[in-house]
């Protein structure tokens, strides 16, 4: 009967449900407390005795993957942190609790040696040219204990030679007495020299752009979108209620290149449930720092309990972000409107994902998530007989499967009526330019996940303040009952004349060069006890 009327019955269940175990992300590494790869036991014992190494003071906050190395950052918030920029040799340590190896070496992790070392690193980024971007905050301590032995400095390493190829100190005009920068986004244009980095000043309320080619930076400050929302400063994580009401612009992600040759930068203040956006055409232009207010776009709120500190977007426009209040990782497909019904949860774990501090997507479209129980570390006491820090991984396709972010999911578009591409692609046309990047990394063997058991049937639409939505009839036509438009990606694109260009056509008009006379416009156990199909196939076969 429903088919005759052209309707599909879709059951939507609120996220206000009991906690569940994560089924998609798989634990790769875990620690009760961090350990470092000292040159020998004698030096390690000396560091322990002197207080240069205090294991209980080390908290990992950032993760990034490249080749056979998994980078982990450990800020010097407390005494006894022997190295801030480290990595795991994944050839030697497939799983377990490996020692962290200082990168590129021990000497380069000396606190206070401003010109030659990194004092404190937070989140880092590997670009498609094989370079590791690290912002040294130059700080030791946190909050009222903070000292600044060194200035903020951009450090870039060549990962093929493991040498630093650039150090750039941020000038005083780009910071202020309240500056705290913990996030970075890297924008590569037509070649490796056409590179920009963007830094979010969380407590100084600004956005700093740096040009690799010009070796110069500038600051955007005159925007209220960088500030916290006074109604969103209350947090609840791991049973701890606390207020981070001063936390401004924090997490950032970059879209794929749009048809006008620029990307879209998405960002959120930490004390906020809302996302904002701006074209990198604006950020790349030093002359626009004071007159670009109306070039920034405010998007909708994500919904309740949706504070986020980290976000990343794939090259086909799928954004992943941590949901620190929900012990979860969320998703949004950027070809869809930024509204709660188009946000999904790819995984949740009320033990393993307590404060998923960082989320990354690597060159092979594998996702990496680091969780660290940060509020417990800062505001209470960690139990060092328990597992406190974890790094998870899964293929991106596995994570978004059966969520609203998977546009191939028939629940969000009827079969045999509209051909939905497997991935959102930019409109076809003559190339804007030819990228001149480094040679491609050797690709990992392609693994078929066809034999993997499907995850439990779950829905991922955000909770609506306790209201349960169920048994909604969705029309295969563009307009449903009572003239309500159906929330489907293909219908949204049809109504708005969008030709599947990700992240921006519904936000920014395609930029054209200026013309004369024309205004420019729960519960998770270890991997070997979980053995999801794809993990078992990849590592046991």
UniProtKB/Swiss-Prot annotation:
Assigned keywords, A-Z: Glycoprotein, Secreted, Signal
Cellular compartment(s): Secreted
Signal peptide from the UniProt entry: 1-21
Sugar attachment sites: 144, 215
GO biological process: cuticle pigmentation; male courtship behavior, veined wing extension; melanin biosynthetic process; regulation of adult chitin-containing cuticle pigmentation
Domain of life assignment: Eukaryota
Cellular component annotations (GO), alphabetically ordered: cell hair; cytoplasm; extracellular region
Segments for region (Disordered): 443-463
Any matching Pfam family: MRJP
Purpose of the protein: Controls the pigmentation pattern of the adult cuticle and larval mouth parts.
Family designation: Belongs to the major royal jelly protein family.
Protein name: Protein yellow
């Amino acid at each position: 009967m429903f088919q005759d009327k052209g309707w599909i019955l879709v059951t939507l269940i609120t996220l206000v449900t009991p906690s569940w175990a994560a089924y998609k992300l798989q634990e790769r590494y875990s620690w009760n407390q961090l350990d470092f790869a000292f040159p020998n036991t004698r030096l390690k014992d000396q560091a322990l005795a002197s207080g240069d190494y205090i294991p209980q003071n080390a908290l990992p906050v950032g993760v990034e993957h490249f080749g056979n190395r998994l980078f982990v950052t450990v800020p010097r918030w407390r005494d006894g942190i022997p190295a801030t920029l480290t990595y795991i040799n994944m050839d030697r340590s497939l799983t377990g609790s490996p020692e962290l190896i200082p990168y590129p070496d021990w000497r380069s992790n000396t606190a206070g040696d401003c010109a030659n070392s990194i004092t404190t690193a937070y989140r880092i980024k590997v670009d498609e040219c094989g370079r590791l971007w690290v912002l040294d905050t130059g700080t030791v301590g946190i909050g009222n204990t903070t000292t600044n032995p060194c200035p903020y400095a951009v450090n870039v390493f060549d990962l093929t030679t493991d040498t630093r190829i650039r150090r750039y100190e941020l000038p005083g005009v780009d910071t202020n007495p309240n500056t705290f920068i913990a996030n970075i986004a890297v924008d590569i244009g037509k070649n490796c020299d056409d590179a920009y980095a963007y830094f979010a000043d969380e407590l100084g309320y600004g956005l700093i752009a740096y040009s690799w080619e010009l070796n110069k930076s500038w600051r955007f400050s005159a925007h209220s979108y960088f500030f916290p929302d006074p109604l969103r400063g209350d947090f609840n994580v791991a049973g701890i209620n606390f207020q981070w009401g001063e936390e401004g612009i924090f997490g950032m992600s970059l879209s794929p290149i749009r048809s006008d040759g620029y990307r879209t930068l998405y960002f959120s203040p930490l004390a906020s449930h809302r996302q904002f956006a701006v074209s990198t055409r604006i950020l790349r232009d030093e002359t626009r720092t004071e007159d670009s207010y109306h070039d920034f776009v405010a998007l909708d709120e994500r919904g309740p309990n949706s504070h986020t500190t980290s976000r990343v977007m794939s090259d086909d426009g799928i954004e992943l972000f941590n949901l620190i209040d929900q012990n979860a990782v969320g998703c949004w497909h950027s070809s869809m409107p930024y509204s709660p019904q188009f946000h999904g949860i790819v995984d949740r774990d009320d033990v393993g994902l307590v404060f998923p501090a960082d989320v990354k997507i690597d060159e092979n479209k594998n996702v990496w998530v680091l969780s660290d129980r940060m509020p417990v570390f800062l505001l209470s006491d960690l139990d060092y007989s328990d597992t406190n820090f974890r790094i998870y991984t899964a293929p991106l396709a596995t994570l978004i499967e059966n969520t609203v972010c998977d546009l191939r999911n028939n629940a969000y578009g009827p079969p045999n009526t509209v051909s939905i591409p497997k991935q959102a692609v930019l409109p076809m046309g003559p190339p804007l330019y030819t990228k001149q990047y480094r040679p491609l990394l050797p690709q990992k063997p392609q693994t078929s996940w066809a034999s993997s058991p499907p995850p439990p049937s779950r829905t991922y639409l955000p909770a609506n303040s306790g209201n349960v939505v169920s048994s909604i009839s969705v029309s295969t036509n563009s307009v449903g009952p009572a003239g309500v438009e159906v929330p489907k990606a293909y219908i949204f694109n049809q109504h708005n004349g969008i030709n599947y260009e990700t992240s921006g056509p519904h936000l920014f008009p395609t930029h054209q060069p200026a013309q004369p006379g024309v205004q420019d416009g729960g519960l998770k156990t270890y991997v070997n006890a979980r053995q999801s199909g794809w993990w078992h196939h990849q590592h046991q076969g």
